[in-house]
Structure formats: structure tokens, C-alpha cells
Amino acid sequence: MVHLTPEEKNAVTTLWGKVNVDEVGGEALGRLLVVYPWTQRFFESFGDLSSPDAVMGNPKVKAHGKKVLGAFSDGLNHLDNLKGTFAQLSELHCDKLHVDPENFKLLGNVLVCVLAHHFGKEFTPQVQAAYQKVVAGVANALAHKYH
């Protein structure tokens, strides 16, 4: 559960309504793979990840980034029940994929950077603070099955 003030919730949902999930999702996942290259080991089936340009232009990275942000969007609609919303994804990433839960925090922080880049002055410190709460809540929910 993420505790947002009404103003924070409004800021998050208003900005999210302007997000191009296809573009931002691919960029966020791509940046994760470039900035934290050890995360690439979970995406060996994606083909060429040999350079930043290869990662950022990889259609499988873009497609999976879109899928990731689709799940994130679903979470924004269920901020009062993030653990329930992400229960199946948590189980998949824990039991089958064996993803280090720290990677969820990294991706959340990368997403915040990408949003700041895309929205500039509109991404005020207050909006960032609200998004930091949300991505921390999502990361915690995704790590739930690890505990």
C-alpha cells in the first residue's frame, strides 16, 4: 500500500495520463540494461545487447518495456492493494526467473529519471517525491514473495 496525499495522487495520475507507455517503457528498461549491465543476464533471449545503441534499439527490449509499464499502470489503479495486484508477477520473478529484488528498485529509479527527462519542468520535486513513493511501493510489492 502506498500512502499518498490527495495532491500526490492527483499529481501521479495527471502526469501518468500523459505518458506514452510504449516510448517510456522501452526507454526505462533499455536504460536499466545499459546503466546496470548485470541486469542483462535476465534478458539473454532478447538478442543483441552488446552496446547502448543495440540495447536502446532492440525491439524486444521496447516490447518488454511496454509490458512492464502496462503492469505499472495497473498498479497505479490499485495503489491500495499493490501486493495483491503484483502477487503473480512477484511469484514469477521470485520462483521462476530468480530476479534479485533489488532490480525492482533500480528499475523504479530509472523510470523516475526517464519521466523527469520527458516532462522537464512539469516533473517538479513534489511530483518526483510522489513518484518515488509509488515506485518504492511497487518494488516492495514485487519483492513480497521473496520474504
Swiss-Prot record:
PANTHER family: HEMOGLOBIN FAMILY MEMBER, HEMOGLOBIN SUBUNIT BETA. Red blood cells. Heme b binds at residues 64, 93. The modification N-acetylvaline is found at residue 2. It comes from the Eukaryota. GO terms for cellular component: blood microparticle; haptoglobin-hemoglobin complex; hemoglobin complex. The modification Phosphothreonine is found at residue 13. The lineage of its organism: Eukaryota, Metazoa, Chordata, Craniata, Vertebrata. One of its GO terms (biological process) is hydrogen peroxide catabolic process. Belongs to the globin family. Gene3D superfamilies: Globins. The modification S-nitrosocysteine is found at residue 94. Pfam families: Globin. This is Hemoglobin subunit beta. Keywords: Acetylation, Heme, Iron, Metal-binding, Oxygen transport, Phosphoprotein, S-nitrosylation, Transport. Residues 3-147 form the Globin domain. The modification Phosphoserine is found at residue 45. GO terms for molecular function: haptoglobin binding; heme binding; hemoglobin alpha binding; metal ion binding; organic acid binding; oxygen binding; oxygen carrier activity; peroxidase activity. Heterotetramer of two alpha chains and two beta chains. InterPro entries: Globin, Globin-like_sf, Globin/Proto, Hemoglobin_b, Hemoglobin_oxygen_transport. The modification N6-acetyllysine is found at residues 60, 83, 145. Involved in oxygen transport from the lung to the various peripheral tissues.
